[in-house]
Amino acid sequence: MRRRRWTRSSRLALLLGSIALLLTGCSAHDAEKKLRFGWPTGVTKQAEEMRVLWTWTGVTALIVGVFTWGLIFWACIAYRKKGDELPKQTKYNLPLEIFYSIVPFLIITGLFYRTIVVEDDVNKLSKHPDVSIQVDAFKWNWQFEYHSYTDASGTVLQPVYPGQKHVADAAETKGQIGCDEASSNDSYSCGAPGQQGAANGPLYLSTNGSSDEIPVLVLPVHESVRILEHSEDVIHSFWVPEFLFKRDVIPYGTTSTGRDNQFEFTATSTGSFVGHCAELCGTYHSQMNFEVRVVTAEQFQAYLNALAKYPPGDKNYPARQSLALKAAGMSPYATTTHPFNTDRTARSASQNQGS
């Protein structure tokens, strides 16, 4: 009997030692990577919240699975046939039935609650985001209009190019450039797309993509950004894969104020990321790309100031976006994607160049 106990203890110690040895060989980074369970790496605060929900859902499923399979194997071994004697036939076990009815319900309730909490956080709109940007989608490109930027000191920056009066002076805005704050639904009404003026939007702080130049959406890291979406023709969809989030851009003008989807996020990593239209919208849908460039607050402020120096439509500054990016110390052109070829007969760029 003593030898038997010693054998069981030795086996248990060997098992625990093996587990400890395996754990010591895993770094914190490796453990975090394994706990992702295939979840992609995001670059926003909201993406990390979704990752945590996914991780704990997977851990919960593993615990339930291990417990369930453990009971199955235990029953198979402990109650295996040991002779010709017919085992005692049992039925009804009230405590057990209550257990496996209540516990799954509690698990589902907990997961449902956490899902609702994370979903609300992802869709939450703050009263005063650090940056407010209007995104206009059209076949087959994008236009970005910077409506406001509040720096770390709480100052609302309103750069203008020489000879133009502050848009905010004419619009009498409440911390927003060219936008009126609507207290009824905690959103912003910025006028119809394409009709930028003193009261509709900051024309001098907009960038417009074309078949020759990819539009670059420059954003500050670790600051809240609100995106207000407009579509001038059909349904599009704003999607940046690294954000792990997309939202449809509905055609403007379905009501008196238009239907403007909006959302907020906070980027946590600097870098350049390609954005796409994720809703089939016509011939060049697959090439309707843009670039998101997350930079430091200093670079972002420098970019806005530089962009304001070059009036849109000025023949002396045809590539104002490139000039502003270069002035802020960044690559003047997109690095994650390239402009599309409007020649529908060309099969590839190389063939088109060689013809």
Regions found by a protein language model. Give the residues of each.
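Hydrophobic alpha-helical segments
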Residues: 2-63
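Non-transmembrane, membrane-proximal soluble domains of secreted or membrane proteins
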Residues: 27-54, 76-355
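Alpha-helical transmembrane segments of integral membrane proteins
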Residues: 58-68, 100, 104
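Alpha-helical transmembrane segments
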Residues: 65-79
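General helical secondary-structure elements
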Residues: 1-7, 76, 316
